[in-house]
């Protein structure tokens, strides 16, 4: 697939999950460096907020906005996923008062980038994840998925959250 970064084409590899598909279990790294598996949240609905780096304005904004919304969602976990080191994620969450969303890192599992179809393969952000939102039910069935066409733009929060209403 192709998305853009400041209007320039960027190739994104892997299969991006579509509504009705099932996302297989994966393992990420929490802020305490412990493994965090998707299946750890088997009894909950999940919002996967995927982005290149928490140290960019748009990515930070998405974490803040989903954190605000997470407090209003019942039986739902918001996972904010990037390749940032857990130390950077923890620093950001502490400074910003992020308590309702959980930041997790792909730094020990780059295969996840392809598994979720967000592997940036070309351009200056190659090796990071493209911006996307995937909403899953308790059995990891995809309820909503958006691969954001322009990496510098925010996802459609309303569409993602509407499937959880």
UniProtKB/Swiss-Prot annotation:
InterPro entries: Redoxin (IPR013740), Thioredoxin-like_sf (IPR036249), Thioredoxin_domain (IPR013766), TPX (IPR002065), Tpx_CS (IPR018219), Tpx_Peroxidase_subfamily (IPR050455). Keywords: Antioxidant, Disulfide bond, Oxidoreductase, Peroxidase, Redox-active center. It is an enzyme of class 1 (oxidoreductase). Its EC number is 1.11.1.24. Residues 17-165 form the Thioredoxin domain. The active site is at 59 (cysteine sulfenic acid (-soh) intermediate). It catalyses: a hydroperoxide + [thioredoxin]-dithiol = an alcohol + [thioredoxin]-disulfide + H2O. Disulfide bonds join 59-93, 59-93. One of its GO terms (molecular function) is thioredoxin peroxidase activity. The active site is a conserved redox-active cysteine residue, the peroxidatic cysteine (C(P)), which makes the nucleophilic attack on the peroxide substrate. The peroxide oxidizes the C(P)-SH to cysteine sulfenic acid (C(P)-SOH), which then reacts with another cysteine residue, the resolving cysteine (C(R)), to form a disulfide bridge. The disulfide is subsequently reduced by an appropriate electron donor to complete the catalytic cycle. In this atypical 2-Cys peroxiredoxin, C(R) is present in the same subunit to form an intramolecular disulfide. HAMAP family: Tpx. Thiol-specific peroxidase that catalyzes the reduction of hydrogen peroxide and organic hydroperoxides to water and alcohols, respectively. Plays a role in cell protection against oxidative stress by detoxifying peroxides. This is Thiol peroxidase. The gene is tpx.
């Amino acid at each position: 697939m192709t998305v853009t970064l400041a209007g320039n084409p960027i190739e994104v590899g892997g299969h991006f999950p579509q509504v009705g598909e099932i996302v297989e279990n994966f393992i990420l790294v929490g802020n305490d460096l412990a493994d965090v598996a998707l299946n750890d949240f088997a009894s909950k609905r999940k919002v996967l907020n995927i982005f290149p780096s928490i140290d960019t304005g748009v990515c930070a904004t998405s974490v803040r906005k989903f954190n605000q919304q997470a407090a209003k969602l019942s039986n739902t976990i918001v996972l904010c996923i990037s390749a940032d080191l857990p130390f950077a994620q923890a620093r950001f969450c502490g400074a910003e008062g992020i308590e309702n969303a959980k930041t997790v890192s792909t730094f020990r599992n780059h295969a996840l980038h392809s598994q979720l179809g967000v592997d940036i393969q070309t351009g200056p952000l190659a090796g990071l994840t493209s911006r996307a939102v995937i909403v899953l039910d308790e059995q990891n069935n995809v309820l909503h998925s958006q691969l954001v066409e322009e990496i510098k733009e925010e996802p459609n929060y309303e569409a993602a959250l509407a499937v959880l209403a």
